[in-house]
Amino acid sequence: FTPAREGVPEKVCKQLITDITKEYRAIKAPVVPFIKATQDRVTLEIQRGCIRGCRFCQAGMIYRPTRERDVETLKASAREMLQNTGHEEISLSSLSSSDYSELKELVNFLIEEFHGNAVNISLPSLRIDAFALDVMSKVQDVKKSSLTFAPEAGSQRLRNVINKGLTEEDI
């Protein structure tokens, strides 16, 4: 490797933001298109990284360690982003949404705060072994909110090989 410019180090080191709440710069007033888009929603990153160690997941390894955003910061960002965009859906995004420690509080806030607007809550990347039925039933009560569960393997042997940590009974 020969750098194209002087002053560029030969070895590039990974940079890591340890406090993702302090360094949070959400796009609070994004450009909203005039047409209906498929992903017509606000996306709120609730945490970065993953506590799981699934052997197939590159993102789980790259974004380590797991870092959660402060729930109060997320509440303020959600309020501002939904008001600024007029979207009727918010996606709580992370590699494993159900592992966020303040998920119940955040979902309850969103339901209470935007009850009159019937804002949908989308929870992608849920783990079968980590979701709470009470939270999920509240999400489903609002409107057409969506839940996306992470795929599991077809056999116990394969689940063991890829380090899913689930049994047939769990599923």
Locate predicted features.
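N-terminal [4Fe-4S]-dependent radical SAM core
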Residues: 1-43
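Conserved, mostly hydrophobic/aromatic
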Residues: 50, 54, 74, 123, ...
